[in-house]
Amino acid sequence: MSLPMMISMLVQALYNIVDSIFVAKLSENALTAVSLAFPLQTLLIAVATGTGVGMNALLSKSLGEHNYKKANKIASNAAFLYVCSYIVFLILGFTIVKPFYKSQMGNADMQIMEYGIEYLSTVMIFSFGLLAQIFFERLLTSTGRTIFSMTSQLCGAITNIILDPIMIFGLLGCPRMGVTGAAVATVIGQCVAAIVAGTCNHKFNHEIKLDFHRFRPDAHIIGTIYYYAVYRFCHDLLHEQNPHRFLFYSYSRIWCILQASEFLLYASIRSEQRYNTYYCL
């Protein structure tokens, strides 16, 4: 069971690396803009994975007790939380992205800000693909079907790798979309992974059935999910990137004012460090 999880983590790390490789061919400013999106992207992933960890903790107990009715209720409440999370990130995608980049860039380079707003807005507004992907993958993991979780991530990553050059550079009749193309390719890859994971759940995950007939949110279940989720949430925000994640925002405000190339070098090193960390895990 551990090998599929290791491959899944490696594939997740490759998403950012592949995007960076193709975006770097556009310009230095394009890669800098994408790198500046890391803090909010980390927040998005932390919320999604944290909720998944909380859901898995409750599901494991219920499935161990063969209490499938309660397991279905837990899964339905978790799905409700993912929908609520998407609504929050949808609103943030429309409201916070421009102030977020402006707080880092000031008036240093408007092209970087323009690229960044295009990229991050697309990723956050259409984050339903990522949230659905992680939700269905966590359901598969909770019942030990990690091979299907790995398969869904591979499908999403391969889709992203194929679409990145096509949408960024305008190949095969597709209009040249630049940085926006990288974001669209990522979103499509996430949606493909979500569809594959959802299909695998429907066909193979017989222990858990999502049922929203007469559904009512359960405050106790939701509270317990977030009780366990907060540990993973803090891990993703603090431990995995500590101390670089918090310094990243501060450094970007300085380096983008001085010269983009210094910040670009730092961002590239951080991407490789993330890859090495996932590989070691």
Model-identified regions with their sequence ranges:
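Short alpha-helical transmembrane segments in multi-pass integral membrane proteins
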Residues: 1-2, 59-128, 174-226, 279-281
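Hydrophobic faces of transmembrane alpha-helices in multi-pass small-molecule transporters and flippases
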Residues: 2-10, 120-124, 147-154, 196-199, ...
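Hydrophobic residues within alpha-helical transmembrane segments
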Residues: 3, 7, 37-40, 80-84, ...
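Generic alpha-helical transmembrane segments of integral inner-membrane proteins
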Residues: 6, 10, 14, 18, ...
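Helix-terminus/linker motif at the lipid-water interface of multi-pass membrane proteins
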Residues: 10, 14-32, 101-110, 166-176, ...
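Small-residue-rich hydrophobic transmembrane alpha-helices
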Residues: 31-91, 130-149, 254-281
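Alpha-helical transmembrane segments of multi-pass membrane transporters/permeases
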Residues: 69, 82, 139-166, 180-187
